[in-house]
């Protein structure tokens, strides 16, 4: 099984992302914002819950410094406290200049977004 630290590094190895330096320090800052323990980084993926893996990859998406973050069901495997942290995390990304487009069936999460389109 992969370890989260191996999962996290993969996007930075793609040619399109090679100009973005990977920083464990920045990753752990994101972990703190998302309520993740630093030791998760060193566990095996099968020892990390689905909700924790989801938040780890949200941190990676933010580290790539893209102008648009597109996320499908970012809170589907999360409890209310973690959902609130994810919403606050996305708001901080928006304050830093990123646009965040999220698809969600979670009405509580959606109600915390700046703009809402219901289908």
Feature names for model-found ranges:
Residues 2-17:
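Q-loop/switch helix immediately C-terminal to the Walker
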Residues 22-39:
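Conserved ABC ATPase "signature" region
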């Amino acid at each position: 099984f992969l370890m989260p630290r191996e999962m996290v590094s993969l996007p930075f190895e793609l040619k399109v992302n090679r100009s973005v330096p990977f920083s464990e320090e920045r990753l752990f800052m994101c972990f703190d914002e998302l309520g993740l323990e630093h030791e998760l980084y060193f566990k095996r993926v099968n020892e990390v819950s689905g909700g924790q893996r989801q938040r780890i990859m949200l941190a990676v998406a933010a580290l790539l410094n893209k102008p648009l973050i597109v996320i499908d069901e970012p809170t589907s495997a999360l409890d209310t406290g973690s959902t609130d942290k994810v919403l606050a995390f996305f708001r901080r990304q928006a304050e830093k200049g990123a646009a965040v487009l999220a698809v969600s069936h979670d009405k509580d999460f959606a109600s915390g977004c700046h703009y809402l389109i219901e289908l």
